[in-house]
Amino acid sequence: MVSPPTIRTRRARWVVLVAASSLCIGSVVAAPASAEPVYPDITDGLVHHFELNETSGTVVANTGTAGAGADGILVNPDRAARGADGIRFNPDDYADALSGAYVRLPDDLTAGMQAVTVDYDIWIDPANVGEHQIWSLGNKTSCDVAGGQQGQLFSSNTQRLRVAAGTVNVQQNRVRLPEGVWKHVTYTQSPNANGTTWTGTLFVDGVQQAQSATITTAPSVNAAGTNCNFLGRSQVPGNYSFRGTLSDFRVYDRSLSGAEVVARAAQGNDEGAEADAAAIDLGLTSAVVEDIELPKLGTVAGSAITWESSDPSVVEVVTPPSATSARKVPILGVITRPALGADDATAILTATLRKGSESVAVREMTITVPAEFDEAHSVDRDALDLELHSTDNVRGNIELPNQGRWGSTIVWESSSEYVSSSGEVTRPAYGHPEVEATLTATLAKGGAEVQKNFDVVIKPLPREEENERYFLGYFKGEGMADGEQIMFATSNGNNALDWTGLTGGWPSLVSQLGDQGLRDPHIVRSPDGDTFYMIATDLNWYDQGGYAINDTQYIEVFESNDLVNWTPQRHVKVAPDDAGNAFAPESLWVEEIGAYAVFWAQSLWNDPVNRTGQGNAQMWYNTTRDFQTFSEPKVWQNPAPQSRIDTTAIKVGDEYYRVTKNEAGNAGSDIFSEKNADFLDSDINAWELVAPALGRTTWQSTAGYEGPVIFEANAGDTACPGQFYLWGDRYTNGGGYQAACEANIEAQTWQAKTITMTNAGVPRPRHGTVLPITLREWNSIRGIPNEDVATTVDIAVDDVRADQDAEVTATVAAEDGFEVGGEVRFTAGDWSETVYLEDGTASVTIPARLPEGEQSVKAEFLGFDILLESEAEASFQVLPAVAASVAVTDRCVAGRVLLVVTATNDDERKVSLLIETPFGAKPVGALASGKTHAAVFTTRAASIPSGTLTVAVAAGDGSDRVQSVYTVDYGAMSCS
C-alpha cells in the first residue's frame, strides 16, 4: 500500500522534511525573503468547509458558515483511514460506490447558489482505477440505485480530469491528475450575462486547465435541491469507490476570482515545491560513474523540474525535445570522467522546481565524478555492484554473471553439489529439508582480486500433482476505464472452455508504474512447478490516448509461488533505447539453455531523438533465469518490410511450435504457425511454415486475429480430451477470444469451440494466458479449503539369518494417488532409525545379531506438509547364523540305549560341529554343504529319562567365524 506523504498546509512539517533531506545530498535554496510568507485565508462566501482532519469517529465537521447543522458523515469508516492530513478512502482494496468508504454531505449543499467554487487538496492513490467520482452533488429518486437522475455536478479523474455539470464536461482532453502526489484543485462556476448559462473553469495548482461557457446546469443542480451529495463516491452505484486522500474540502457560494484561486493554491504550491526539491534522490552523488536519469516531476507534489549543470564538461544535462512524441524520453545527466590518474571532477547540478504559476524552489547538488578506475577500483566497484536475487528462496537456476560492468572477470565456486559454479540448481526432493550453500565470487582484473560470498537457501521441490483445472490471466480491453489491468479467472471443472472470473470482472492487479496499464498478461510456470512469472505490456490506451503514444521499452513483471500472492510490480527495461514499444511479452522455458526466453514485439524509431518514423514491427528476445536480470536484447523475427507481433509458443516432443500474428492490417491480419527444433533460431527462413492462416480458416474468414494462446489439454479435460487448445483474439468485428481444439498440433484448420465466461466483466477476455493447474491450486485460488491427504504404509521384510542385516522397505502411498515425501521412522526392539522417503519408499538396514526367532518391525510415516501420518508393522524370522538340521533317535544294543544324533549341513559353507549330550561330546572337524553326520552315544543304561542336547555348528575362520547352537529336546527312552 502506497501512503501519501505529509503535505498539508502546515509549514512546520515542510520545514522538517526539507531540512532533513537537505542534510543528505544537497541543499534547497529558497527565494530570498525577509520573513515567513503570509497566506491569508479566503473565507468570504465559504459556506461549507470540511477540513477532513478528524482522527476518529464518523462526524466530518463543517466549519463554514453553514455550521454544525451541515456536518458530513463518514460512511463505511472501516474502509477509511483518518488523520490530520485528510481522509484516506479505501487504502487497502477496491469497492463499489456503495460498499466503499465515502462521506455523505448534507442535502441541498448548493441550494440557491447562482455561482459556486469547489476547492480542495487531493492525493490520488496509484491503485485508483475505473469509473469513479471524486466528489458529486446530485438529485435522484434514490441515491443507492441506478437511474432516476434529476441532475448532477461531479468531478472524476477517469481518462482525464473533468468536472461534469449536467451534460457538459469541463475538461482538457487526456490530461489527468498525476497519481501519488498532492494537487490543489479548484472549480468555479459563474453565471453568464444571459442569466441562463454558466461558465465553468477548472484549475490545478491555481493554473487554469479547462473552461466551458455553455453549461446549462445551475450550481444548485436542481430546483428541488440535491439529496445525493458525496465525497469519494459516485452517483452510479456500480462505479468504483474512489481510492485516495481528500483534504480541506471547501464550497463557496460565489466564483472565486483568478487571483483568489492562485492565492488558495499558493501555500501548497510553495511548500510542495520545497518538498519536491528536498525529496530528489540521485543516489550516491559522491561517486557518480555513469549517466544519471534526472527526474522531470517531483515525487511529493508533482512540481515540474528543469536542470542545469555548472560544468557540462563533467555533467552535461541533455534535455529531450519538447515534441509530444518525445515526452517519455528522460532528462539525462551525461557523465564525462577524468582520465586514469587525474583528480576527481565535480559539478553542481541545479534543479529548478515550479508548481503552479508562481511557486519556485531550487535544489543544488554537488556531483563528484571519479577519474577512470584503475584495476583495483574496477574490481572493488564490480564487487560492490554484484548482487544475487532472492538468495533465501532459491527455486531454480541462479543468474551468475561472469563479467563485471567495469571489466572484472568473475569466477564462481559453490560449497554444495546442489548448485553448480555456473548457477544450475538441483533442488532437494519433496519432503527433504532445504539446503544451505555458499557461492563465492572471485573478481579479478589484472593484478587486482577480491572475493564476495553469497549465502543461498535452496528450497526442496514441490509435490508433483496432476493438472485438473485451468487458470486464466487476461485484460478486458481498452474501451473501459478498468479494462487495461490484469483480471483472473478459473475454469469450472476440468474444462478450458468454461470460466468464472475471480473478482466479478474487477482487476486483481493494477499497474502503479510506467503507463499504469497492464495488457497481454503472460504467465509461465517454472519447470519445477512452484514459481510463476507473469509479464505484461506497459500500456494504458484508455488513459493515455491510444497505443501510438506508447514509447516505453519496459515490461511489467510479477512473481508468485501460489497464483494467489504476487510480489510487488517490477518495471523492467527489456527493449533497446530506440525501440518505440515492447508489446505483448511472453516467455518460455528453454531446456537447452537452462533459462527462459522472453520475447516481445517492437518497432524501432527512424529518428530515436524525436521518436518519429516508426519502422516495421519485429519480434525480439532476451534470456533470463530469474526475471530480475536479463541478457541484452536480440532480433528474433524480422520479416522487413512486413511486420509480425504477438508470438506464443509451445514445445511438443523435440519441436518448438510458435504461433504469430502477421500485421497485414485489420481483417487481413491473421495468426500462423511455424516449427523449429532450435527455439532461438533468428533465421525466419529456417522455421518451417506449418499453418499459414489459422484464424480465418478456423473461425471467421473476414475477421482479423491476434494474441494467440496455445496449450495442451489436461488429462481428463472434459471438452477437448487428448487435444491441444488454440485461442485467438478476434480484435475486428468484436468478439475477443475465440477457441478451437485439435489433436494434431500441425492441423491447418482447427475445430471451433465456444468459450463461456461468467463474472468476468466482458463476454470474452482479451489477450492473455491459460495455465493448467492442480486441483489444490484451484481450490486455493478460489478460497476453498484443501483437506489434508491420508496415507498408508506397506512394509516389505524377509527372514534373515542371525548374522545377517535385515533389509526393510516401507512404501508410503497417498490417498489421492500423487507424490509423497517426508520421513519414516523404523523401530525394532530397542533399535530405531529415521530416513527420508525417496520416490515413495524408505529403506533401512536393521543390524545383524538380532535374537533368533520371530521379530517385528514398525514403520511410522511421520507426515509432511499436507500428508497425514500413518504406520504399519510386520513380522519376520531371525534364523540361525549357520543353517543345519539336527535329529535325535535311539536304538537298543544288548539291552542298552544308544542315543543317535544326526546333523545335516544345510548351509552353503563347510561347517564344524560340536555335539554335546549328557552322555558325552563329539567334535566333527569338517562337514561339507549338504552332508550329514551321525554320532552315536552309549548310555550304558536300559532306559534314560527325557533330556536336552546341543549341537554347535560353526562356519568361517577368524573374524568371519560364526556359530549357531541348536538345542534339541528328546524324550525318555527304554529298551525294556
Give the positions of each predicted feature.
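Solvent-exposed beta-strand/loop surfaces, strongest in extracytoplasmic domains of secreted
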Residues: 15, 787-881
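Extracytoplasmic low-complexity segments
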Residues: 17, 32-96, 213, 262-271
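Extracellular/lumenal carbohydrate-interaction signature centered on repeated Trp-anchored short motifs
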Residues: 40-43, 104-118, 174-183, 220-225, ...
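Extracellular glycan-recognition modules
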Residues: 43-47, 56-60, 94-161, 193-199, ...
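Extracellular glycan-interaction surfaces
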Residues: 66-98, 118-129, 149-217, 236
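Extracellular glycan-interaction patches encoded by glycine-rich segments
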Residues: 93-94, 166-167, 212, 223-247, ...
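Enriched for extracellular/lumenal, surface-exposed ectodomains of secreted and cell-surface proteins
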Residues: 352-355, 443-445, 828, 851-873, ...
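Carbohydrate-active catalytic/glycan-binding domains of CAZyme proteins
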Residues: 432-433, 457-788
